[in-house]
Regions:
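Generic preference for well-ordered secondary structure
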Residues: 4, 29, 36, 52-55, ...
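Alpha-helix initiation and N-capping motif
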Residues: 17, 42, 65, 79, ...
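N-terminal Rossmann-like or analogous alpha/beta NTP/dinucleotide-binding catalytic cores
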Residues: 1-77, 163-181
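Catalytic adenosine-cofactor/nucleotide-binding cores of aminoacyl-tRNA synthetases and other
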Residues: 59, 64, 167-168, 178-257
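Short secondary-structure transition/capping segments
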Residues: 40-55, 79-84, 105, 111, ...
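Bulky hydrophobic/aromatic packing residues
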Residues: 1, 7, 24, 31, ...
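Active-site cores that bind ATP or allylic diphosphates and position pyrophosphate for catalysis
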Residues: 66-213
Length: 257
């Protein structure tokens, strides 16, 4: 299945989703279900947000990133990334901030909850959950909220993703608990890196499919190179979808052990 995570429309480039789907098709990857587009599913996220609100688990926050950094770096600042500046505002303070015309973000009242979860690569994990944002000041729903709603709605049982998201998992587990959602199993794998050992990123002009095409590298060879990069075949080997699925399942079992 394919999910287009495009909630922050201010940062999404027009045509980027279509280009990604085209690139996947060119290297022979197909999907069995209709493509899920998060920007078309905001009603589901709004329902989840209202459930949190009904449990008094949300509060308005007007803090800027600069203010949060300054408060957290103070001698007696909070140990977590958000210092709680807006958590217990009085009625008068709330009225003053609302009158300013600035739109607030919405944060959860996590109360420093300790969350434990198991990762099949990294083992047992324990994290303190911060009061993280679930709705941004621009009105966009945050990734943490959308992803747990979508995972549950799509009956996702296993999440396999880059280990840059390992630290985000506790917040998602906390949301799953509050919303009564099923927790999937997690596998966080090392990120794909370039020949300079830097994380592959469009921001850093990493290798693209179009760039490979200009170098006369076929889509089939790009597919083979990608599969070889995670140790599922030799670079010169061409494997079909059935072989790929079988070997991918095997490497997850090896990662777990």
């Amino acid at each position: 299945m394919i999910r287009i995570e495009d909630l922050d429309l201010e940062r999404c480039r027009a045509g980027s989703a279509e280009q990604q789907l085209s690139d996947l098709a060119k290297i022979g990857l197909e999907w069995d279900q209709p493509v899920i587009v998060q920007s078309e599913r905001t009603a589901l996220y709004a329902l989840a947000l209202e459930r949190l609100r009904s449990e008094d688990l949300l509060y308005e926050c007007w803090c800027t990133r600069a203010e949060i950094r300054e408060a957290s770096s103070a001698p007696h600042g909070a140990p977590t990334s958000y210092p709680g500046s807006c958590r217990e505002l009085s009625s008068a303070q709330l009225a003053q901030r609302r009158a300013s015309g600035r739109r607030p973000a919405l944060r959860v009242r996590a109360e420093g909850a300790e969350i434990e979860f198991f990762d099949r690569v990294h083992g047992e994990q324990k994290r303190t959950v911060d009061d993280f944002v679930v709705a941004r000041q621009n009105g966009a729903f945050a990734y943490h909220l959308a992803v747990v709603v979508d995972d549950n709605d799509q009956s996702i049982e296993e999440v396999v993703r880059g280990d840059d998201l390992l630290d985000s998992t506790a917040a998602q587990c906390w949301l799953q608990e509050q919303l009564g959602l099923v927790r999937p199993s997690y596998v966080h794998l090392p990120l794909l890196r370039d020949d300079q050992a830097l994380r592959m990123s469009k921001r850093d002009s990493s290798v693209t499919l179009d760039g490979q095409r200009q170098l006369a590298v076929s889509a089939a060879q790009v597919r083979s190179n990608l599969i070889a990069s995670i140790g599922l075949c030799d670079a010169a080997e061409m494997i079909n979808d059935e072989q790929l699925l079988s070997r991918f399942s095997s490497i997850l079992v090896e990662s777990a052990s």
